[in-house]
Amino acid sequence: RSRTEFADVIAEYKTENTEIGIDVSKWQGDIDFDALKSAGVEFVIIRVGTADGIDGEYLLDSKFKQNIEGANKAGIPVGIYFYSYANSKDRAIADAKWILKQIEGYQVDLPIAFDWENWSFYNEFNLSFFGLTDMANSFLSVVEDAGYEGMLYSSKTYLENIWLNTDYPVWLAHYTSKTNYAGAFSYWQLCNNGRVSGINGDVDINIRYLATE
């Protein structure tokens, strides 16, 4: 199975208008954030948690505190993502409020991402495309009202076919060397087989596009 070296991504994609980073969760185990910083990691998007299925209780990612403390201490800018099982606007709002509680007291300068991938439940939820977008927008507006940036995480296929134009920044997942996604996006997750000093095993590598004046 092929690997994508972080240094190669820097060599290919780093410009004055991009930053190269990663996203992490408990699956990456114990991370050496100083090593990440030395390797040129410019940001890290940390999984805060998920829910135990539909209407389930919230589950804090078991490495969340360790990861956000490590990143804050190493001076690596932090974003957040949450894997949501929301099936209503109310639940999406509750998700956002739970996240805001978990990140209190930590430095979070980058967006909080709504990651919703429950396509197998989609019909059961009886949601229209409009309802789904409305749900994401509700989550993201709570995050923004609290002073954070919000963004929507999704794969290219679903961004093209399901999510109606959301007014929020997009974190595009498309595992390829050059994306042909035509919409606007602020972050691009380009692989899930990344390798970087400080992490044992695979990690997702991302590019952040800085707003050009």
What annotation goes with each model-predicted range?
Residues R3-G29, N165-E213:
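Functionally critical loop-and-helix segments that line ligand-binding/catalytic clefts
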Residues K14-S138, E144-A146:
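Substrate-binding cleft of extracellular glycoside hydrolase catalytic domains
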Residues V78, E149-G150, V170:
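Hydrophobic anchor at the start of a short beta-strand
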